[in-house]
Regions:
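Catalytic centers of hydrolytic enzymes
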Residues: 1-139
Length: 139
C-alpha cells in the first residue's frame, strides 16, 4: 500500500494527509475475473496483509490465504468483480495485468482522503476515530 505514516491524535491538517499519502496517484476502477482477483489476495497474504475493502474477510496462515470472502461469499473464479485501486498498481503489478476493463479518475488519491476525513469529522462532531473490524486475520 501507499500509506506512509500514521495519524497522531489531535488536529488533522492537509499537510498530514500529504505525509500519510505523498504520491500523485489517481483512482483506477477495473473489472477482473475472480481467478485473477485471487492472485491479488495471494500477494496480500504473502505480505502479511495490506489495506482492503470493508466487505473483505481474509484469514492468512503462514503467509498463505486460508479463507477469503467478499460480502460473506467465496470468490467465484468465473465471476467478474469490480474493484477500485491505485493507477500505479494497475500499471505495474502482475496481478492486475489481466483486468477486463479500466476507468481512471482524474482526482488524486490524497484529495479523496482529504474529502473523506472532512466528511467523517463533519458527521461526528469534529471527531475521526478508527477501530479494528476484522478484515484481515493473521494466524
Amino acid at each position: 500500500g501507499g500509506i506512509r505514516s500514521t495519524i497522531a491524535k489531535g488536529n488533522l491538517t492537509v499537510g498530514d494527509v500529504f505525509t500519510l499519502y505523498p504520491f500523485d496517484n489517481v483512482l483506477s476502477v477495473i473489472t477482473m475475473k475472480g481467478s485473477e482477483l485471487k492472485k491479488f489476495f495471494d500477494t496480500v497474504a504473502a505480505y502479511g496483509g495490506m489495506p482492503v475493502n470493508a466487505g473483505v474477510r481474509l484469514v492468512i496462515s503462514n503467509k498463505k490465504v486460508k479463507s477469503l470472502t467478499i460480502n460473506g461469499k467465496a470468490i467465484n473464479d468465473s465471476q467478474t468483480y469490480t474493484i477500485a485501486t491505485l493507477n500505479y498498481l494497475v500499471n505495474t503489478e502482475d496481478y492486475f495485468k489481466n483486468h477486463l476493463t479500466r476507468m481512471d479518475y482524474s482526482i488524486y488519491v490524497w484529495d479523496y482522503y482529504t474529502a473523506y476525513f472532512r466528511h467523517l469529522a463533519k458527521n461526528n462532531n469534529g471527531q475521526i476515530t478508527a477501530s479494528k473490524d476484522g478484515r484481515i486475520t493473521v494466524e
